[in-house]
Amino acid sequence: FGSLLGLCLITQIITGLLLAMHYTADTSLAFTSVAHMCRNVQFGWLIRNLHANGASFFFICIYLHIGRGIYYGSYLNKETWNIGVILLLTLMATAFVGYVLPWGQMSFWGATVITNLFSAIPYIGQTLVEWLWGGFSVDNPTLTRFFAFHFLLPFVIAGLTLVHLTFLHETGSNNPLGIPSDCDKIPFHPYYSIKDLLGFALMLIPLITLALFSPNLLGDPENFTPANPLATPPHIKPEWYFLFAYAILRSIPNKLGGVLALAASVLILFLIPLLHVSKQRSMTFRPLSQILFWTLVADLLILTWVGS
């Protein structure tokens, strides 16, 4: 899945650059510039749909990649793992600020709700939120800085990816048995490059199918309405890949408690290398750990379902 994530990143950066050429980061123009892109720019509709749904595939791949890493004990490569978690956090930040850019109803209210969470931080919270907004509400300054972040962060992700790979190459990658694989080493090209092409095809075909046949399947219809600070949508919810965290946030009545639980749900990944006590690396021969692992997977799926 690592190679697929690399492909996702490249695809997203290319489509994103093409979109940025036609996008206007201004509250009065953002929504219309996106509409103009889909109507008047050559293949603009396709580029936009690939970019929007590419994010979903990025998250599918990263969640599978993390799950696979937990299952096979890859987190024992501590540096690689920790940089991976930082990569996940950066990706989540990028996806969040990107979702705000079309400036539809859900963009605006999503930005309002999520940035507001920073006000739960004791003492500095309120100042921090006003500093983040560039004013007393989500408005033009917020949109322009979010565009700047959304442009910058993917390159940060690309840089971190190289560091991630550098640390991985210190030890070599893990395998399903969790044992050294020195005797099985083979040249990357042509063997792995051909093997990866299969994965590329298996990811790109569903992505293109989704972008061409039902591009709005995963989006929120609320985002077809231009942002209106005076009308709150009936239900504010993020894209599906954040629903598990959003469900945790919403289920706790206390604001600070919810924010802490939301943060902890992702930051817990940093602790996993410290919690490993087994003599075996992988879960292949540990039925009890397997039960716990699949319970975790089921939990996340149920949270995602409940969150919607």
UniProtKB/Swiss-Prot annotation:
The residues that the entry says bind a ubiquinone are: H169
InterPro entries in the cross-refs: Cyt_b/b6_C, Cyt_b/b6_C_sf, Cyt_b/b6_N, Cytb/b6-like_sf, Cytochrome_b_C_euk/bac, Cytochrome_b_N_euk/bac, Di-haem_cyt_TM
| Source species, domain of life | Eukaryota
Which GO terms fall under molecular function for this chain's record?
A: metal ion binding; ubiquinol-cytochrome-c reductase activity
Q: According to its record, what are the GO cellular component terms?
A: mitochondrial inner membrane
Cofactor details (free text): Binds 2 heme b groups non-covalently.
User: Record-annotated residues binding heme b b562?
Assistant: H51, H150
**Which co-factor is required?**
heme b
**Which residues are recorded as binding heme b b566?**
H65, H164
Its membrane topology is listed as: Multi-pass membrane protein
Any matching Pfam family = Cytochrom_B_C
Spans through the membrane: 1-21, 45-66, 81-101, 146-166, 194-214, 256-276, 288-308
Please describe the quaternary structure of this protein. Answer: The cytochrome bc1 complex contains 11 subunits: 3 respiratory subunits (MT-CYB, CYC1 and UQCRFS1), 2 core proteins (UQCRC1 and UQCRC2) and 6 low-molecular weight proteins (UQCRH/QCR6, UQCRB/QCR7, UQCRQ/QCR8, UQCR10/QCR9, UQCR11/QCR10 and a cleavage product of UQCRFS1). This cytochrome bc1 complex then forms a dimer.
Q: What else is known?
A: Heme 1 (or BL or b562) is low-potential and absorbs at about 562 nm, and heme 2 (or BH or b566) is high-potential and absorbs at about 566 nm.
Q: What does this protein do?
A: Component of the ubiquinol-cytochrome c reductase complex (complex III or cytochrome b-c1 complex) that is part of the mitochondrial respiratory chain. The b-c1 complex mediates electron transfer from ubiquinol to cytochrome c. Contributes to the generation of a proton gradient across the mitochondrial membrane that is then used for ATP synthesis.
Protein family:
Belongs to the cytochrome b family.
Q: What is this protein's name?
A: Cytochrome b
Organism lineage string = Eukaryota, Metazoa, Chordata, Craniata, Vertebrata
- Gene symbol of the encoding locus: MT-CYB
